[in-house]
C-alpha cells in the first residue's frame, strides 16, 4: 500500500473511531464549558507593568473556583510550578518559544548534607494537583544532566543512584487535564500520570527509560513519542511506557494515530513498547508489588520506527510478598495490545497481542475519556489570543 493509500486508510479509521471528529484538521465541534478566549494574567521574562515575572506567582494570585488563563511570554522560566487550583490554563507563546525548566533528580539530597533525597515523585518541574488544568503551546523540561551520569562506568565513585527526573506529574488530585502542542523533555520518567483522565493532542514527549508511566488514564492523539539514546550499548536502551493501571480501570495509556520516533543514536530493535510496572505498595500483610496493578498500554494506527523492539513488550522486576525479587511478564501481568501499527518497527508475532475488529469500537475517544469532551485551542485561536 502506498503512502497515499495508507493515509486514506488512517483517516477512514480515524473517522470511524472518533465518530467523524476531524481532530487532524483542527479539532472537534465546540465542546461544552468555557472556551479559552481571554487572558486573565501575563507572565513575562522581563519586568513589565501588569505582568508577573514568575509563573508560580501568577497561579498563586488566581482566584479560586473559576477558570483562569495565564499567558506566558517567550523565554526560559527556571522554576518549579505547582498548579493547585482548578481551572488554571497556561498558554505559552509556542513550544519552541516558551520553556519551563528546572533540574531535580530522585537521588538529589533535599538540602546540602541531608541524607533525605527527593525521590522520583518529588522531582517534577510542573505538578498538576487540581482538576480541569490545561497546558497549551509550551515546553516543560527537566534539565538534570542524565547523559553525563550515563557515560560513567558502573562502580564509578561519582555515579548517581536515583537518576529519575520527571518533567510533568499529573497527581492523584487531577482530572480532565489537557495538553495541546506541548513538548515534554526528560530522560528517565519524563511523564508521570498518577491518576485521572488526561488528553494529549499534537504534542511531543521525549525520554528513554519508562518515560511515560503511572496509573492514569491518558489518551494521546497525533503526538510524537521520541526515544533518546544511551551512552553505552545495551540490549534495550529504554521502554516507551510503564503503566501501573489498576485492574478495575478499563483504560490506561491509549495512543491513537501517533508516531514513535527516535533521536540519532538509538539502535534498531532496542526499545520495547512497554513493561508492566507493579509499584511497591503497603498492604495489611506487608509491603510488596501491587498485584492489582495490571498495566494497560494500547497503540492504534501508530507509526513505529525501526528502534521499536520486534518482541514488542518486556518484563519488569518487582518485590514479592516474601521480599524477594520477581519478574512480571508482559503477556500475563499486563494488558498490552495494538492495532494497525505500521512502519519499520511494526511486527506481527505471538508476543504482540492484536486488538480484534470486534473490540476496536471500545477504543473511541469518547469511551476512553468516559464521555468527557476536552476543551482545545486551535492554532488560529491561539494566535488571536496572544497577539
Positions of the model-derived regions?
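Hydrophobic helical h-region of N-terminal Sec-dependent signal peptides
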Residues: 12-20
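Residue-level recognition of conserved structural "scaffold" positions that shape functional pockets
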Residues: 11, 26-27, 82
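Bacterial N-terminal signal peptides that target proteins for export
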Residues: 2-12
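Intrinsically disordered, low-complexity regions enriched for glutamine and histidine
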Residues: 4, 29-32
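Sequence-level preference for short, compositionally simple segments enriched
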Residues: 33-387
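A ubiquitous, low-specificity "background" feature that marks scattered single residues
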Residues: 15, 25, 60-63
Amino acid at each position: 500500500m502506498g503512502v497515499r493509500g495508507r493515509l486514506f486508510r488512517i483517516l477512514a479509521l480515524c473517522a470511524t473511531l472518533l465518530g467523524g471528529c476531524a481532530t487532524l484538521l483542527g479539532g472537534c465541534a465546540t465542546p461544552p464549558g468555557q472556551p479559552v478566549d481571554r487572558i486573565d494574567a501575563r507572565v513575562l521574562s522581563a519586568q513589565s507593568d501588569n505582568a508577573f515575572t514568575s509563573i508560580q506567582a501568577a497561579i498563586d494570585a488566581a482566584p479560586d473556583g473559576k477558570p483562569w488563563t495565564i499567558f506566558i511570554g517567550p523565554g526560559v522560566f527556571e522554576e518549579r510550578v505547582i498548579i493547585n487550583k482548578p481551572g488554571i490554563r497556561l498558554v505559552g507563546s509556542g513550544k519552541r518559544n516558551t520553556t519551563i525548566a528546572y533540574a531535580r533528580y530522585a537521588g538529589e539530597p533535599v538540602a546540602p548534607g541531608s541524607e533525605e533525597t527527593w525521590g522520583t515523585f518529588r522531582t517534577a518541574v510542573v505538578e498538576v494537583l487540581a482538576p480541569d488544568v490545561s497546558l497549551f503551546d509550551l515546553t516543560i523540561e527537566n534539565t538534570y544532566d542524565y547523559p553525563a551520569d550515563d557515560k560513567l562506568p558502573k562502580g564509578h565513585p561519582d555515579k548517581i543512584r536515583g537518576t529519575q527526573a520527571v518533567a510533568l506529574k499529573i497527581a492523584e488530585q487531577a482530572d480532565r487535564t489537557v495538553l495541546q502542542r506541548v513538548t515534554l523533555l526528560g530522560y528517565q520518567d519524563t511523564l508521570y500520570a498518577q491518576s485521572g483522565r488526561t488528553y494529549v493532542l499534537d504534542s511531543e514527549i521525549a525520554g528513554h527509560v519508562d518515560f511515560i508511566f503511572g496509573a492514569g488514564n491518558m489518551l494521546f492523539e497525533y503526538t510524537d513519542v521520541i526515544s533518546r539514546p544511551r551512552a553505552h550499548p545495551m540490549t534495550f536502551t529504554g521502554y516507551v511506557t510503564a503503566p501501573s493501571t489498576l485492574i478495575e480501570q478499563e483504560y490506561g495509556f491509549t495512543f491513537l494515530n501517533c508516531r514513535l520516533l527516535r533521536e540519532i543514536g538509538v539502535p534498531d530493535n532496542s526499545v520495547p513498547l512497554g513493561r508492566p510496572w507493579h509499584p511497591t505498595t503497603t498492604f495489611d500483610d506487608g509491603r510488596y508489588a501491587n498485584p492489582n496493578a495490571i498495566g494497560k498500554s494500547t497503540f492504534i494506527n501508530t507509526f513505529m520506527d525501526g528502534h521499536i523492539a520486534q518482541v514488542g513488550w518486556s518484563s519488569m522486576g518487582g518485590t514479592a510478598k516474601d521480599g524477594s525479587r520477581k519478574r512480571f511478564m508482559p503477556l500475563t501481568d499486563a494488558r498490552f495490545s495494538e492495532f494497525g501499527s505500521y512502519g519499520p518497527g511494526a511486527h506481527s508475532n505471538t508476543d504482540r497481542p492484536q486488538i480484534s475488529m470486534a473490540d476496536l469500537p471500545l477504543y473511541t475517544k469518547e469511551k476512553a475519556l468516559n464521555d468527557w469532551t476536552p476543551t482545545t485551542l486551535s492554532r488560529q485561536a491561539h494566535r488571536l489570543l496572544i497577539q
